[in-house]
A protein has these predicted regions:
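Conserved HGGG/HGGXW glycine-rich cap/lid loop of the alpha/beta-hydrolase fold
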Residues: 25, 31-78
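Conserved alpha/beta-hydrolase catalytic His-Asp/Glu region
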Residues: 142-145, 152-212
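Post-His helix in hydrolase/transferase enzymes
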Residues: 253-268
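Conserved loop-alpha-helix segment in the C-terminal half of the alpha/beta-hydrolase fold
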Residues: 214-253
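Conserved catalytic-core motifs of eukaryotic protein kinase domains, centered on the activation segment
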Residues: 51-53, 76-82, 143-144, 228-229
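Flexible "cap/lid" loop of the alpha/beta hydrolase fold
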Residues: 118-123, 127-159
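Active-site loop/oxyanion-hole signature of alpha/beta-hydrolase fold enzymes
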Residues: 22-25, 67-108, 112, 116, ...
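Bacterial N-terminal signal peptides
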Residues: 5-15
Length: 272
């Protein structure tokens, strides 16, 4: 139960909860640690800031670490009209950055959090020192354009969500960790599951633009075909990628020490 010991340890490190605001919605975040670099950790679809429980204690020894709940997730407010978008998510992250009075930040995004941090870099390039994607696409041009998510409404929709989540595990994913992830993701409201999924289908995310800051993608061991480096570097010229063998989609939970070392090595090379 390694992940549980990490969660317990996280309470030893001083943390401060904050609430920023975007479009009248309260955006929850937690700040831990201090240091020359500020890392903002952005969770994935129907997840919340607890996704990063295995990162915060280790990274906060060296950096200021901010975990955020995106709109409609965790303890953050949801849009009353049910309209979610990558712009809304990116602006929520910016509200958190501004509230924290951080100048430049390193953004770490898991799964759906990867296109969120890319969109943030489009909207607020002067605020970004670097990007780290965790088993998620920074270049949505390479994301399957014909992807059709299953219906997510009603009891059958909940079953579909559970099936999607279980497909993210490997036989080596500890059962207690599987249950933790299932509980976290299935408690997200139906409107959030539908709206956040729809936000990833926006054709505007596939535009040919350049994001010049350093970027690292860390892929799960189950990712069978990594993005084409030459094509990706047309959009992200300072893009690098690596893979963590023996992991599923939640690789930062499954092999936290290895993942944390990759983060530190990347951040320590950045200019602030």
């Amino acid at each position: 139960m390694r992940w549980l010991s990490v969660v317990v340890l996280s309470f030893v490190v001083a943390a401060t909860a904050s609430a920023a605001s975007v479009d009248g919605l309260n955006i929850h975040s937690t700040t831990t640690g201090a240091g020359p670099a500020t890392l903002v950790l952005v969770h994935g679809w129907t997840c919340d800031e607890s996704s990063w429980a295995a990162q915060v204690p280790a990274l906060a020894k060296k950096y200021r670490v901010i975990t955020v709940d995106l709109p409609g997730h965790g303890r953050s407010g949801a849009p009353a009209n049910g309209k979610f978008s990558m712009d809304l998510f990116a602006r929520a992250v910016e509200a958190v950055r501004a509230e924290a009075r951080a100048d430049k930040i390193v953004l770490v995004g898991h799964s759906m959090g990867a296109p969120v941090i890319r969109q943030y870099a489009r909207l607020y390039p002067a605020r970004v020192a670097g990007l780290i994607a965790v088993d998620g696409p920074l270049d949505m041009r390479q994301f399957p354009g014909d992807f059709k998510p299953p219906a997510l409404t009603g009891p059958e929709g909940l079953k579909a969500r559970e099936g999607m989540i279980r497909s993210m595990f490997t036989p080596q994913t500890p059962p207690d960790l599987q249950q933790k992830i299932l509980t976290m993701m299935l408690k997200a409201p139906e409107a959030t599951a539908i709206g956040a999924m729809g936000s990833m289908m926006d054709p505007a995310l596939r535009k040919d633009d350049v994001t010049p800051m350093p970027a690292l993608a860390v892929w799960a061991g189950t990712s069978q075909q990594l993005p084409n480096l030459e094509d990706t570097r047309k959009a992200l010229p300072k893009y690098e990628q690596t893979q963590v063998p023996g992991t599923g989609h939640f690789l930062m939970m499954e092999k936290p020490d290895e993942f944390n070392r990759l983060v530190v090595a990347f951040v320590d090379k950045l200019q602030f």
